[in-house]
Amino acid sequence: MSTSPDNLFCPEQNFYGPDSEKIYIDGSLHPVKVGMRRIKLSKTYTLHGTDFSSFPLYDTSGPYSDPSVTIDLHKGLPSTRDFWQKNRTDIEVCPGKNPSPMNNRTPVRAKQGKSVTQMHYARKGIITPEMEYVAIRENQQLEEWIERFSSNGSSVKPVTPEFVRDEIAKGRAIIPANINHPELEPMAIGRNFRVKINANIGNSALASSISEEVEKSVWACRWGADTVMDLSTGKNIHQTREWILRNSPVPIGTVPIYQALEKVGGKAEELNWNIYRDTLIEQAEQGVDYFTIHSGILLDFLPAAQRRTTGIVSRGGSIIAKWCRAHKQENFLYSHFDDICDILRSYDIAISIGDALRPGSIADANDEAQFSELKTLGELTLKAWKYDVQVMIEGPGHVPLNLVEENMRKQLEYCHEAPFYTLGPLVTDIAAGYDHVNSAIGGTLLASLGCAMLCYVTPKEHLGLPDKNDVREGVIVHKLAAHAADIAKGSPSALLHDKLMSSARYSFAWNDQFNLSLDPVKTRQVHAESSQQNTGDGTDDHFCTMCGPDFCSMKKSQEVTGK
């Protein structure tokens, strides 16, 4: 297979329809331009004394929703952040490295003895361009609405660059933004910001190609994924990652142990620190924004894991466990954690400390192995912070609803309020084929309690490698979970979104309903199919085919109230 795919194409940039337009908001502290997507509404809705004829949306699609940008996937996206970095004196070109053939850019790193992390700057009181970008992005150009909302007793205020800096300095939030990923549009992960979602992609030894994975990554961010993880374990891992990074406006994460294992022919016992270190640096120079590193699984925890119903279900965790048993030594990712942090701070790579012992069945939830590792993750968090490395903590897994709250409580206690990033949790073991819904149920509850980012699950979970349609389904369902959690947390912008949808629904403004939904394409398609028996497309009807013209409750309500 060629490592330079020739069947890539730029997707339709008017994807969201004629009522959607790309807008950019300028920063006041730095030369940043923050992209958003604005929906033009068919009428003006008055809510609490404020008129809305349009609604700005938080947008993860980058230039893929801007028709004015020419995109060539073989050359990658425009380098948004290069301009911000050009006057920096704390970075240098990596010696002996050639420019990327895609963007003609030579990788950089921190100068000797320097740290270039967002946490480092935040602790020094410096507001970076990335921090201002995040503040503008989180507000969605709704500062006036948020202020009005807070004047009615809400504790939620508009996000300021100083607030972002303070959250980063305290370790409660991260901005994953490798200095070698200039195509990135910065975003924040933290419980005092919007709940984010991650989409996993990546080939396997049995399926997929570079072009398919690039297509899935673009597809994921266009449907609303805030970050993407490339979990490739098959051929051409390096090349696949390069193509994904150069075409990604969202942060990209990886699990470096997968590529390290490939380098030793899949034999876990032949891994060593030198191979892993070289893999970290290789991926750092490409621009990976965060690494999942399973440093918390220790020899002492393995007996407890052996007593489980489903053992160790983390791929990275099982690799490390096999290495530890083969060598009768402590996890080298734990022993070399200081060395790892020294590398990460040189490129501003965040660490997602992996939950190698997450429960893979509800029978194993909240057990000794899981919480023993969680305590170790808290210990490693403090160590990483000494290096100014940004940290988030990975969480479960399979957890029944009655045990979900304990996970959040212990994570905050053990891990010093570092952001929590969880795979669901899935709340039952019997939902094969529907595990994306299963995951969203647990994720909604956990996010409402403070989980900062949900890792999506697709309908293929436990069954096979997802295709791009599975990616879409997983993203939308988890965007729903994140939005529901934002509402529960009192987010003024999330509540406004729902208020506008309700107003459009009561007004039978069908196009507004389509455009305000999480999946405008599907809602428009489903409505059109249902309306085919009537004349036209149904967008002028004051009813739908569920109730018809004579049994529509909202229509009857309007007749009764006169409004």
UniProtKB/Swiss-Prot annotation:
Positions that bind Zn(2+): H398, H462
UniProt-annotated stretches for the region Disordered: 95-115
Essential cofactor(s): [4Fe-4S] cluster
UniProt keyword terms in alphabetical order: 4Fe-4S, Iron, Iron-sulfur, Lyase, Metal-binding, S-adenosyl-L-methionine, Thiamine biosynthesis, Zinc
Superkingdom of the organism of origin: Bacteria
Binding residues annotated for substrate, in chain numbering: N200, M229, Y258, H294, S314, R315, G316, D355, A356, L357, R358, E394, Y421
Protein's UniProt keywords contain Iron: yes
Record's GO cellular component terms: cytosol
Function: Catalyzes the synthesis of the hydroxymethylpyrimidine phosphate (HMP-P) moiety of thiamine from aminoimidazole ribotide (AIR) in a radical S-adenosyl-L-methionine (SAM)-dependent reaction.
NCBIfam families referenced in this protein's UniProt entry, alphabetically: PRK09284.1 (NF006763), PRK13352.1 (NF009895), thiC (TIGR00190)
Protein name: Phosphomethylpyrimidine synthase
Chain's gene name: thiC
